[in-house]
């Protein structure tokens, strides 16, 4: 009995040791689950964790000398590209990192200066200025007709207007109305104003030659009456021409568009007054399309003024 009891106690002891060993093997913290974890005084686990994170991401302090040279070069290139890429992203300007990271060498600087000096010493080929092409203006095909020419001449002598009015034909003199003798001839059909100072104005001729011829005829009449008349300083003072554009014109639109040059008061005068600057001509434009040009000293000014105004009038043609 004693032997069996001792054997049983031994087996029970072995079983207890096996159970205790298995529990420590598979659940080693089981005996300590009920114990609370107490941190050591002066220890901060959060700072330790953050420090570990920083160490895990920052490899700048890691010794990479054991790596091959090509891997070290790639790492350096990546570090150089990172700030340049951030700069490009912030500023919006595309920069070449390879050019920024590699400064000019002395030889490259010398080559650059030589290139610039070569550019300065290169001969400059003179450029011929091109005259801009101006569109050819549409010709009107209309030639204004001269209606009146006013000319002046100096007879260079004092005249007795009463004697001229009494002895000359087709002459009238009324000093209360006008202080000049009004004389007319039929060929060319003109009128002369003769003043006592010897100045004479001839008007009504249709051409320059007719105006000169008429002035000479009036001077001959004065000579025949006993005055020492001469023929000096003949000059054409004004030429008047007229034409028809053959279409009605919107004068209201024309005066609004060309306010600086034109005036239109239909209650006072039915025509629009257009004062052209070059040539210095005054035009009277009517709704019917009739145009009167005055103020010219030469025939060419009449033609030039009409060619300038014709495209403008065509732009204000009435559609109905």
Curated annotation (Swiss-Prot):
InterPro entries linked to this entry: TBP (IPR000814), TBP_CS (IPR030491), TBP_dom_sf (IPR012295), TBP_eukaryotic (IPR033710)
Single annotated GO MF: RNA polymerase II general transcription initiation factor activity
Organ and tissue specificity: Expression is restricted to the gonads, and is higher in the ovary than the testis.
Keyword terms: Developmental protein, DNA-binding, Gastrulation, Nucleus, Transcription, Transcription regulation
Annotated localization: Nucleus
Similarity annotation: Belongs to the TBP family.
Protein role: TATA box-binding transcription factor. Members of the TBP family are differentially required to regulate transcription and development during early embryogenesis. Required for gastrulation. Regulates a large subset of genes that are ventrally expressed. Binds to a subset of promoters.
Name the record gives this protein: TATA box-binding protein-like 2
Species name: Xenopus laevis (African clawed frog)
């Amino acid at each position: 009995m004693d032997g069996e009891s001792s054997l049983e106690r031994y087996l029970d002891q072995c079983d207890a040791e096996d159970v205790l060993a298995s529990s420590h093997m598979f659940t080693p913290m089981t005996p300590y689950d009920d114990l609370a974890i107490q941190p050591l005084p002066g220890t901060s686990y959060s700072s330790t964790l953050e420090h570990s994170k920083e160490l895990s991401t920052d490899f700048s302090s890691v010794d990479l000398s054991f790596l091959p040279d090509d891997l070290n070069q790639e790492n350096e290139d990546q570090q150089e590209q990172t700030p340049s890429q951030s700069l490009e992203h912030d500023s919006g300007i595309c920069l070449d990192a390879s050019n920024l990271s590699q400064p000019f060498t002395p030889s490259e600087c010398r080559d650059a200066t030589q290139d610039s000096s070569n550019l300065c010493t290169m001969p400059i080929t003179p450029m011929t200025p091109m005259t801009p092409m101006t569109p050819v203006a549409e010709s009107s095909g209309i030639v204004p007709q001269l209606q009146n020419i006013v000319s002046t001449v100096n007879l260079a002598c004092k005249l007795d207007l009463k004697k001229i009015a009494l002895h000359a034909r087709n002459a009238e003199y009324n000093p209360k109305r006008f202080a000049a003798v009004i004389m007319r001839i039929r060929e060319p059909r003109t009128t002369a104003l003769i003043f006592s100072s010897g100045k004479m104005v001839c008007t009504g001729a249709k051409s320059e030659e007719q105006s000169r011829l008429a002035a000479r005829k009036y001077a001959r009449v004065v000579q025949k009456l006993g005055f020492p008349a001469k023929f000096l300083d003949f000059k054409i003072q004004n030429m008047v021409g007229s034409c028809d554009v053959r279409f009605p014109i919107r004068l209201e639109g024309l005066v609004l568009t060309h306010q600086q040059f034109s005036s239109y008061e239909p209650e006072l005068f039915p025509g629009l007054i257009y004062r052209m600057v070059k040539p210095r001509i005054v035009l009277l434009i009517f709704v019917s399309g009739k145009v009167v040009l005055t103020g010219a000293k030469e025939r060419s000014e009449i033609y030039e003024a009409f060619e300038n105004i014709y495209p403008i009038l065509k732009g204000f043609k009435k559609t109905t």
